[in-house]
Amino acid sequence: MGQKDISEKILVDYNDVFADIMNVCIYNGKEIVKPDELENTFVHSQYKAEDGKLHEQERDVTKYWKKGETAIAIYGIENQIKVDKNMPFRMIGYDGAAYRGQLLDKRKSVVPVASFVLYFGTEERWNKYKSLKECIQIFEELDNYVNDYKIHVIEVAWLTDEQLKLCKSDFGIVANFFVQKRKNKEYEPDDPREIQHVDAVLKLLSVMTGDNKYETILYSEEGKVNTMCEVAERLVNKGIKQGIEQGIEQGILSTVSVLRKVGKTDDEIVELIIEEYKLEKEKVLDYLS
């Protein structure tokens, strides 16, 4: 992701997505949090992507949860692609800052702060480093006097089919993508649901997968995409074009592989290859064998 994208809004910052995450992952599908009850606070949410990677020096997204004009809680979400053994320390700092901010604002009543780690990793589960005491060595006689601090991790790639069905926002599309990627590293997008926040979804996929092919679709001359199926088709077309430009056998083999992954039949593949590469049918059939 380039410098010009640093201040752009991220997917989780949209209230419909944020509320969906809370309701599905925290409240077991009950519509406890409504999008119009959420209000941004404290930080301007952004990807810190100077080198294409996600850098988190500030809390990613923080929102007041309000009923009418009365705030009843503060929610915080941190995006992570890798397990971070220091996350409990970071979360203590974020939550402490949220409470301190309320005191500095001289609020009549301080509301609770609930923070969550949105973990997009697909290689391993977040099975450790979920509490302060896991991260430090404590003298046995001192243990009872050291307060523990636990963090709450939402493992996106391990959401169940039942949880995925409960999603009502673009979070469901993104979550399904990472669930399928965990099960099959070669998975190509095939979700037919319409994407509401196309720009934010594709940028999140690029950052969290480390592959900018999704973001480059935003700047293509072919226009906007509306579903992940269209994203896959656009990637196929891009592969064909690159194959033509390279004019090498590997380009054709790669195109055949991608077309098969998105469900094209051999007859359809033959027609596409003949049309784009201007080859004889017999030659094309050699690549399918």
Map each language-model feature to its residues:
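Intrinsic-disorder/low-complexity detector
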Residues: 213-289
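A general recognition-element feature
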Residues: 1-242, 288-289
